[in-house]
Amino acid sequence: AISAVEMAEHVGIRNYGTFLQKVHKLLKNEGTFYIQVAGLPRGYAKGYNHYEDIIWGLFMDEHVFPGADASCPMGWVITQLEQAGFEVQNVHNLGSHYSKTLEHWLLMWESKRTEISEVYSDKSWRRWRVFLAWSVRIARQGGSTVQFITATKSGQEKSRIAVQNRLAPGVYKLPYKERHGPGGGPSKLFTNGL
C-alpha cells in the first residue's frame, strides 16, 4: 500500500497525472492507494458568497503554500485517479472532522506563541495564525473540505475479487449461485428475514 496525506496539492495540477501514474506503477497488483486530499466544492448554493474563499485561496498561494494549486473539486480528483488506472473503492468526506482538527491546531499554535517566536519571526507567527483561523472558518462553512480516498490498482477479475475480499472480508467468498441463486436472482441466503 502507498499513502499520500495532503501532499498531492503540492504536486500541482500540471504534475498531478504524472504523480498518480508513478504511484500506480510503484504499486503491486492488487495494491491499495490511500490518498487524503484537501478539496473544494464543485458549486455553491444559490446566494452563497464565495469571494471569501477566493481571497483565502489567494492568501494561501502567496503567503503559506506558494505553488500549491491542486485543491480541486472531488470529481476532478476521481477522474485523475481513474485516468491513471486506479479503481476508486471508497470516498470519505472528513470535512466536519477536519474543521475541528484545524481548530485544535489553531489553539495549540496560539498557546505556543512564546516557543514559536524563539524560532520564527512575529510576522511568520501572525501569518500562520491568520491561515489557521481562516481555514477553520472556511472549513466550517463548507468552502473547503478534506476527502480520504481508497483506490486500488485496476486489474483482472481475479485481482479485483482479491482486493474486494481484503477491503470487505467474506463478502465475495460465496460461489456465484449461492450469492445470486439459480438464474441470477437473489438466493434464500440474502432474502431470509426480508
Which stretches of residues belong to each language-model region?
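Beta-sheet entry/capping signal
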Residues: 1, 30-33, 87-88, 148
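A short acidic, Gly/Pro-enriched loop at the edge of an enzyme's catalytic core
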Residues: 1-2, 143
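A short glycine-rich, Lys/Arg-flanked "PGG" loop and its adjoining helix->strand segment in the class I
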Residues: 17-32
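Substrate-binding/catalytic lobe of Class I Rossmann-like enzymes that use SAM or dcSAM, i.e.
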Residues: 39-159, 166
